[in-house]
Regions:
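Extracytoplasmic/peripheral linker and loop segments enriched in polar/acidic and small residues
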Residues: 9-18, 165, 170-174, 186, ...
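Gly/Pro-rich hinge or "lid" segments in bacterial periplasmic/extracellular proteins
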Residues: 10, 21, 30-31, 36-87, ...
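Ligand-site clamp/hinge motif
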Residues: 49-51, 80-124, 265, 274-276
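Periplasmic binding protein-like
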Residues: 106-107, 112-116, 123-130, 266-316, ...
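Acidic-aromatic pocket-rim loops
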Residues: 134-136, 140-158, 283-337
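Append "and occasionally in soluble cytosolic enzymes with long acidic Gly/Pro-rich linkers
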Residues: 163-265, 348
Length: 370
């Protein structure tokens, strides 16, 4: 798989079957996160795996793939050989719909269950009840740390511009983190169906409590004042001829991201920062991935995102932040024999009290989490 895949196996040098029920894996580098991947990776017969495996999966779950109409629906049938309790539903049709279409289908009584966005949670539909599920899903905005002018190679060897003249200033990044009101955002955007995010791994054992920051608009303004960002006639700050203004990109087909972006821009006005929101397709967003703030969505039951978003050469290091201390902790976290021993190391990569370094809001503030 590719390096940006949740099932990244690029570090596996060789897999050797020692007998009918055991396999030994040899790696190119220490990488204990592979254990998380193996926990969810399907194991299939060699003869059944090929280029068309994705369209003809083999598994031991409750259901089997009966039909796949790409872009429209999949039809599942109960697996007669399932080892557990017999499925109560013998046939399941999963229709692929945008969130507004799913809501309309529920209103028309065309579906039994509809997955839609929290922005619609205040709407009632006869004979349906709302089910809210807790997740590890999070939303965060990358804040490019370099000065503009450089380039960085992305997918396909394309050189993308790097750096932002506003978010390059650590005072701006810290002020944004302290100035955003997450509770108000949750109330206004998703009708209270959410919890504040302070990192990509808040609910995980490798999450750091030092990532949590209370909203303090006065302190955020103080940081900007002390850094020389003075308010202009229109209330927007400037420093050395640079206006405190930047574009924020989000996926235009996501109503929650659109609403979060708008609320974020509105809150930043109080700090004297002008944010222009830009809804676009991912094809149009990626050229800006290292030069402009982007609202991303993350969520994993493995520390892979904690590593990749913060490691210097990580595929998710859109902030382009490089720090030897952070890298060292992340590398050490991957190398320890027992994953439980990696938790504290991942936490120190986020904030190390001894060195006063890390990606936390009081440190490099490379992201602002919502």
């Amino acid at each position: 798989k590719g390096e940006a895949s949740e099932a990244d196996l690029s570090m596996v040098r060789e897999a050797v079957a020692t007998d009918a029920t055991h396999v030994e894996l040899y790696l190119t580098k220490p990488y204990n996160m592979l254990l998380y991947t193996l926990a969810v990776l399907g194991i299939v017969p060699e003869k059944a795996y090929g280029d068309d495996y994705g369209a003809n999966p083999i598994g031991s779950g409750r259901y089997m793939l009966e039909q796949w109409d790409k872009g429209q629906q999949v039809i599942l049938k109960a697996n007669p050989d399932y080892y557990g309790e017999e499925p109560k539903m013998k046939r399941v049709v999963v229709a692929f719909m945008e969130e507004d279409a799913a809501l309309a289908a529920a209103r028309a009584g065309q579906v039994d269950i509809a997955f839609t966005a929290a922005v619609y949670s205040d709407q009632e539909i006869a004979d349906y009840e709302l089910l809210a599920c807790e997740t590890v899903d999070s939303r965060g905005i990358s804040l490019p740390t370099p000065q503009p002018g450089g380039t960085k190679e992305g997918d396909g060897g394309v050189a993308y511009p790097v750096g932002n003249a506003v978010t390059n200033d650590i005072a701006v990044r810290r002020a944004i983190n302290y100035g955003v009101d997450r509770e108000t955002m949750i109330k206004n955007v998703i009708n209270g169906y959410g919890t504040p995010a302070y990192s990509v791994c808040d609910k995980s054992p490798w999450g750091s409590p030092d990532m949590k920051v209370e909203t303090d608009v006065a302190y955020a303004k103080q940081l900007l004042d002390e850094a020389g960002w003075a308010a202009g006639a229109d209330g927007i700050r400037e420093k050395d001829g640079v206006r405190a203004a930047f574009d924020l990109y989000y996926a235009s087909n996501d109503s929650v991201r659109q609403a979060l972006s708008a609320e974020f821009a509105n809150q930043m006005k109080e700090l004297g920062i002008e944010v222009s929101i830009k809804g676009a397709s991912w094809d149009d967003i990626y050229p800006h991935q290292y030069s402009d703030p982007i609202l991303w969505g993350w969520g994993s039951n493995a520390p892979v995102e904690t590593y990749e978003l913060n490691y210097s050469t990580g595929w998710g290091n859109y902030a382009c932040y490089e720090n030897e201390n952070v890298d060292s902790y992340l590398e050490e976290a991957l190398a320890v024999p027992h994953v439980e021993d990696s938790y504290e190391l991942f936490q120190k990569a986020q904030w190390d009290e001894a060195t006063q370094q890390g990606v936390a809001p009081q440190g490099a503030a490379t992201w602002v989490w919502l």
